[in-house]
Amino acid sequence: MATIFDILNTLNNNNNNKNYFESCKRQRTNNKTNKTIIDILPPMDVTMTNDKLIIETELAGISKDDIEISINDSILTIQGEKKKNLNKQLIIEKSSSSPSLLDTKEDEASIEEFDEDDIKPKSTETTSTLSNSKENKKDENKSKSTEKKFISERSFGNFKRYLDLTKFLYQLDLNSINTQFENGLLTITINKKLHYSNTIKININ
């Protein structure tokens, strides 16, 4: 015979399962409606002092120009994109595509190198040029640098972080927002109002 505790336990489990499935459904619908896919969730520290609110977010390896901060409906949003380092790819491409100076100097023919006895028929010239081009291609393939990754742990892509300011928005002076980005750490400081209250007195006319 089931006791009252067993009945309450089953009801609680059913409610938890229902809430779980509803949250999964909401998450799926949000992913469908949102066009941007969030790849990175940066860590954040929020500290409230006597006179200010401090929000610190780690954004290592991200340029200041790729960070966007906004407040809409008491929701603070920090979003942007962490891009791959293109300088390394450009260096690799330049080193692999550009021939060395020694090779170019050897290939260039000067007037002093040729004599009348060195002139050959056209057929031999074409065969020699074909063989030289094949050798040059082999040398180019050997000189091309290959890149092999042994460890790949860094993540790139879009990032976004929300902070709900509803609970203490009445304390903050939004006109005093100050931002600082140094050594990969974004610091947002919002001063508190000198006189604030969460209650509003309404007079009767």
From Swiss-Prot:
- Using the UniProt annotation, give all residue ranges assigned to the region (Disordered): 99-147
Q: Which residues form a coiled coil?
A: none
Question: Which residue numbers delimit the sHSP domain?
Answer: 35-205
Basic and acidic residues biased stretches: 134-147
Composition bias (Acidic residues) maps to: 109-118
**Entries under Gene3D superfamilies matching the protein:** 2.60.40.790
Q: Which UniProt keywords apply?
A: Stress response
Q: Which InterPro entries match?
A: A-crystallin/Hsp20_dom, HSP20-like_chaperone, HspG1-11-like
Q: Which domain of life is it from?
A: Eukaryota
Concerning Pfam families, the annotation shows:
HSP20
Family, similarity comment = Belongs to the small heat shock protein (HSP20) family.
UniProt protein name = Small heat shock protein hspG12
Q: Which organism is it from?
A: Dictyostelium discoideum
